[in-house]
């Protein structure tokens, strides 16, 4: 059984060493380009031509990143992720990439509040090969120990075998384990505490991706999760301890591969390239494979191949659908539209394959527009209602206090006023601020199996279209800005989405975001603008963990 310990997370991704991320890119120009005024990308191309040329690091729309003498790009990802790759490369939460192959045991990540969980790696030298490879990952949570032996058919052992995994899902203490199928793979989903979950790939690769609710509460080789990329290898004790041994060269094995090894790996990986949905990774994995082949021969190269094939089969990022304002939708695949209508029980998102869950939204009339009245989340026979009036939370029709935990459902407050409802093994997360910000997250098991306003999660926005499931007749959107309103709306909204927001919140579709902001101002005046600014502040925090100041007009 191939194992992945999955994460339910949100986030922000920045490439730190661009030449490492794009090793086969042409040499950068000798002169430093002018810093572009816009970092937006459209259909894989940087809108501003000064934004570099590393097209394979952009998947459709997103952002391009430019640093002096470097040519890289970044995507609009919603995942804070740390990775250990089969070739011995590590990537921290903020994208610092390094190679580390020293035998021993190392803390990849741990909780710093109470020390109630940790993820430890065991690196070993096998059969006299060069360097070391990942052989075991150990997860300790509140007294329970889960050992995952890498590159084996039956890898999981709970508490030394004293607690066999006999059910699906299987729960022990704070940990839930469930096997979910995706095309070509069985995935084991393990979640604990506030959405700290790990992906253990079937070869010798690990990914850990915590929810932003854990900001400032994690340390280890992955980094301290302080939401500050400048902290990498400057403050964390686990990072500093390994620093003398990172990026060590091995005789005859350059990091970018020997030419003959590169050709071998191209032949090994090429048959899988045509069916890879994330083919931007091909060159990166080819060079990683070549390095691994030089270090440990065919066996180690095959683990890189397995890493590549699994990455190809999974979506590039976590599926995120957002409802914001009055009422704007961004689907899982980033189609965007707005509608007004006092619709009851509108299907926002659902598992339309196994019918295990759905998320529905009720709207109500408010003068000339509509807003959210209630969000209903169903998992099998369990129904959770989030009611705006009074911030009521009901499970099975009964009021519950927060935090709440029962079977595979947990509900808790994040950042004071964002309610998070997490459901496993479906890997469904719903975040709602009881106003006009609703975020739905799903993961790999539902790739191509969802329906509703959020669309079919398949990385194809062309098959996402507005469909209210016949629940109501749509009413026209209120008119936009008058000529008198427009100048002030433009001033406020351009200031809200200034250039600093690009880096802090990885803002995609900036012109569209400004238009939405202006719509809110022209709909409800200064109050509409300030409500929108606060919603954006929360959206930025949910997706990327960054905390923004609201405009002075709203303080």
Curated annotation (Swiss-Prot):
InterPro entries: Mucin_vWF_Thrombospondin_sf, VWF_type-D. It is an enzyme of class 1 (oxidoreductase). Residues 80-266, 319-494 form the VWFD domain. Pfam families: VWD. Its EC number is 1.13.12.6. Residues 1-11 form the signal peptide. GO terms for biological process: bioluminescence. The cysteine residues presumably exist in intramolecular disulfide bridges. The N-terminus is blocked. PROSITE patterns: VWFD. Keywords: Decarboxylase, Disulfide bond, Glycoprotein, Luminescence, Lyase, Monooxygenase, Oxidoreductase, Photoprotein, Repeat, Signal. GO terms for molecular function: carboxy-lyase activity; Cypridina-luciferin 2-monooxygenase activity. It comes from the Eukaryota. Disulfide bonds join 82-222, 321-454, 343-493, 352-451. The keyword Lipid metabolism does not apply. Glycans are attached at residues 186, 408. It catalyses: Cypridina luciferin + O2 = oxidized Cypridina luciferin + hnu + CO2. One of its GO terms (cellular component) is extracellular matrix. 60 kcal/mol are required for the blue emission of light (460 nm) due to the oxidation of luciferin via a dioxetanone intermediate, in which the excited state oxyluciferin bound to luciferase is the emitter. This is Luciferin 2-monooxygenase. It comes from Vargula hilgendorfii (Sea firefly). The lineage of its organism: Eukaryota, Metazoa, Ecdysozoa, Arthropoda, Crustacea.
């Amino acid at each position: 059984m191939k194992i992945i310990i999955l994460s339910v997370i949100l986030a922000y991704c920045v490439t730190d060493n661009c030449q490492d991320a794009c090793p086969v890119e042409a040499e950068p120009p000798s002169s430093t380009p002018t810093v572009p005024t816009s970092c937006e990308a459209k259909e894989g191309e940087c809108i501003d031509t000064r934004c570099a040329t590393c097209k394979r690091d952009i998947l459709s729309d997103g952002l391009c990143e430019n640093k002096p003498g470097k040519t890289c790009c970044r995507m609009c990802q919603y995942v804070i992720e740390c990775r250990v790759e089969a070739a011995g490369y590590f990537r921290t939460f903020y994208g610092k990439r390094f190679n580390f192959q020293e035998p021993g045991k190392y803390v990849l990540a741990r909780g710093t509040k109470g020390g109630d969980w940790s993820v430890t790696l065991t690196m070993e030298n096998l059969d006299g090969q060069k360097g070391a490879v990942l052989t075991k990952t150990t997860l300790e949570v509140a007294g329970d120990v889960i050992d995952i032996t890498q590159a084996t058919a039956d890898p999981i052992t709970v508490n030394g075998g004293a607690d066999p995994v006999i059910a699906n899902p299987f729960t022990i203490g704070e940990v839930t384990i469930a096997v979910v199928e995706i095309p070509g793979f069985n995935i084991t989903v393990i979640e604990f505490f506030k959405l700290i979950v790990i992906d253990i790939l079937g070869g010798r690769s690990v990914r850990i991706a915590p929810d932003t609710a854990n900001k400032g509460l994690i340390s280890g080789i992955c980094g301290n999760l302080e939401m500050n990329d400048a902290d990498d290898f400057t403050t964390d004790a686990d990072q500093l301890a390994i620093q003398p041994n990172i990026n060590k060269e091995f005789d005859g094995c350059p990091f970018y591969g020997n030419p003959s090894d590169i050709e071998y790996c191209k032949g090994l990986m090429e048959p899988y390239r045509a069916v890879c949905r994330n083919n931007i990774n091909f060159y990166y994995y080819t060079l990683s494979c070549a390095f691994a082949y030089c270090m440990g021969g065919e066996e180690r190269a095959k683990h890189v191949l397995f890493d590549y094939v699994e990455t190809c089969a999974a979506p590039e990022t976590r599926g995120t659908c957002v409802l914001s304002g009055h009422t704007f939708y961004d689907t899982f695949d980033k189609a965007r539209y707005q509608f007004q209508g006092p619709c009851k029980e509108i299907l926002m998102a659902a598992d339309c394959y196994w019918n295990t869950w759905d998320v529905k939204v009720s709207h109500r009339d408010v003068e000339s527009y509509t807003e959210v009245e209630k969000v209903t989340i169903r998992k099998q026979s369990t129904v959770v209602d989030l009611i705006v009036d009074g911030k009521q939370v009901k499970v099975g029709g009964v009021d519950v206090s927060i935090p709440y935990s029962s079977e595979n459902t947990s509900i808790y407050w994040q950042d004071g006023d964002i309610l998070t409802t997490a459901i496993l093994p479906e890997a469904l997360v719903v975040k709602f601020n009881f106003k006009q910000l609703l975020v739905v997250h799903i993961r790999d098991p539902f790739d191509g199996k969802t329906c509703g306003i959020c669309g079919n999660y398949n990385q194809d926005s062309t098959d996402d279209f507005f469909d209210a499931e016949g629940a109501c007749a749509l009413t026209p959107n209120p008119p936009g800005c008058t000529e008198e309103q427009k100048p002030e709306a433009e001033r406020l909204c351009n200031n809200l989405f200034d250039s600093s927001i690009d880096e802090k919140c990885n803002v995609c579709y900036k012109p569209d975001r400004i238009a939405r902001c202006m719509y809110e101002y022209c709909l409800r005046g200064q109050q509409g603008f300030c409500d929108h600014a606060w919603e954006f502040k929360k959206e930025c925090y949910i997706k990327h963990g960054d905390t923004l100041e609201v405009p002075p007009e709203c303080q």
